[in-house]
Amino acid sequence: MRAAIGTLIVATSIVQLANGFFGTFFSLRVAVEGFDATLAGLVLSSYFAGFTLGAVRSDRIIARIGHIRAYAAFGGLVGAATVVMPLLVDPYAWMALRAVVGFGCAGLFVATESWLNAKAPPAMRGRVFAIYMVGTFVALAAGQLLIGGIDVTASGPFNAIAALFALALVMVSFTRAEPPQVSRAPQMPFREIAQAAPIAVAGCALSGLIAGAFYALVPAWMQGAGIVRETIALFMFAAVAGGLAFQVPVGRLSDRLDRRHVVAALGVGLAAVAVALVFLPRSLPVVLPVAALLGGFMSTLYPVSVAHANDRMPPDRVVAVSSALILLSGIGSVAGPLIGTQLMVGFDINGVLYLMAGAALLLAVLAVGRSLLRAPPAHRARTFEVLTPQAAPLAHDAGGHDETPLAGSDRADDRAARRS
């Protein structure tokens, strides 16, 4: 059992290595092609659109055909779309193909995480998902470092990415882990969340907008500004590594304080760092620590917002709540590159940084305002979890049963069992 679980985690880390590399490489490649600003924004946001759709719909495919065949189907979609892209260098074709990649990646994560959740022993589940998330962040960060030694204009990077996805598919196909039975996730309660935890709604949507604009547009701008790819790779690596470093301390802080105050502080910090990047000297020793801070603030807005929603919602709604918040974050991620590319026409990269700062400050103001109107909950059924909507977890629940609801997140029952 442990070997099978390890295989699933390693396979997902390989997927994230490919995904982290693909995201930054594709941003650079779109910049090289010189598409119109609006078309470039649509192409860069199409991955997030596909990912969002996959996060909320792939459970139907998994429930219909089972985990292994669904994983093979999703992996095949991603690999095929990736290989075709250098053969069809057209913005409209790339929009469709990149959306297919996003949908397939979401399906891979949902299949893997629901499988892990159902099969990991309850006493080990927390450790399993901790290792899973660390592997996710490390692989995403390592993927950025691959940018330094590639020819952006060649088809080789597309082939290498497809090969990594194929390797993950082969590993999962040979696993001996028995796939779980699955059931449908309940309907997403948008109105309930908006009434119970409006800051969670705003936080997930705005954090998606901020992250989408950053990861899609900043690498492309850096290349256009004549910055060498090795420096781009280090900058993006620092941002992802900062996101990992912030998870535990911010999580502990949010478990002790009103989470809305933590959201407000993160928003102010992110805005300050984004504006600082406008004025600071753009030398590597100065920019790398700032990139790590930016990544830290940016990567913790979403999980704190999700934790705030879980504080306000009944335990039996957590799976549906998580799915709804992923969708909201995805909508924000689609909007980020679209708005950012238009701002870059008039303000260059400063437009993107001001967009990020403005969205973060708006969230901070909303969080402070709500905290003045409503007291925090007296009891919290859940603690902070390391989450990112473009990575994981998308599909683990609390029950430890073989019949696993998909497209959400809930480990409360496991924690309650350990406390009793």
Predicted features along the sequence, with ranges:
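Helix-loop boundary and gating motifs at the non-cytosolic
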Residues: 1-48, 200-203, 212-221, 225
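Cytoplasmic helix-loop-helix junction between adjacent transmembrane helices
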Residues: 99-134
